[in-house]
Amino acid sequence: MVLVGSVATSERFQRQLVDAVSAYTVGMPWEASSRIGPLIGPADGKLLRALTTLEPGQSWLVEPERLDDSGTLWRPGIRLGVQPGSEFHQVEYFGPVLGVMTAATLDEAIDLVNQVEYGLTSGLHSLDDAEIQHWLARIEAGNLYVNRGITGAIVQRQPFGGWKRSVVGAGWKAGGPNYLYGLTRWIDAPPAAPTDYTDALPERIGALAEGWPTGADPISAAALRAAEAARASDGDVTWLRRALASDAIAWETEFGVVRDVTGLVREQNAFRYQAVPVTVRFGSGRVVDLIRVAAAGLRTHARVSVSAPRFEPGVDAYLGSAGVSWWAEDDEHWRARARHLAATGGRIRLIGTDVRATADAVGGSPDVALYDNPVVSAGRVEMLPFLREQAVCVTAHRFGTPRQIEISILS
């Protein structure tokens, strides 16, 4: 917990916090009065240290108390004076102990939270709309909660999954619209004719699909020029044209908007996306596959980098003009680059190359996610590696008075 400004020195708030924590009844699950149950096993290691040992400068506001011989039942505790960079600041403890930090400003508090390697859930209590907007724009976590508790995620309302080291691999939020995408392997299918699916689309999006991308869409126009410069076949150019249209539709209807599918009056449950850096390794295959993947990333506004043994004429110029970093390098140099990514973290999209060699190079690092599905024309699938999801839940009333907050797309 980070207390900002005057609340950090408020005796009234401190009394309320102590009262709230002390009011919890600790007991076994079969006891109806229990609010806090046992640990899954006896406290040991870092958790036992968190429950019993203070770091320099810290003090107990409420000291945890062991309640049984097994070491699984503990009365919750609160420690004050947690310093930036200390063990209690940086480490996750799965037990009934709360650490309190202080910050002079909201930005300082956000920085303290974002310094942690993990980013599963985060919450804010504030009645200032500007503070809420600022916090929503800067905090790094997969599930955000405003003016309510930060647990109890419900399927569809608050799809569950984190950022940073709170997520491992190429999966997506449980209970969200993309969860099954990460559990399957996608292959391309013959594209449907535009008239097969545009009837149900909004007029503006339907018009885009009917006409396919033209010069009015700079991302698509640049990609098509690159394909022509690389002497792609007419069939490949047609496939690329339809893939680019699929990207535009996916962006306008899913990835580039903020959606609240629940429509509740007293609670806002927004789902949105943020672009993330991706390194693409192209080994072999159709040049339009590389152009198509790069264009998908550019559509999301992600920072895209490309590595390949060589580039067809015009492709390197296309990438450079679009702001994409690119390297012509052999497999040995690529593996060295992948090892560097293992140290810094990131996502890798593999095209026409052996995933095992790259997996060996990154050494199983949990900070790297590998995507090696065949390239597909569906934007709803191909754009996902360039995005991360965020669920935002806001209590939309104050003592029954409606109070809506604008939740914007992430930059």
Role assignments for model-derived ranges:
Residues 2-6, 15-29, 33, 37, ...:
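Conserved C-terminal structural/oligomerization subdomain of aldehyde/semialdehyde dehydrogenase
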Residues 45-58:
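Long, low-complexity segments enriched in small/aliphatic residues
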Residues 60-65:
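Diglycine-centered glycine-rich loop/turn motifs
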Residues 4, 10, 40-44, 48:
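Amphipathic, non-membrane alpha-helical segments that mediate helix-helix packing
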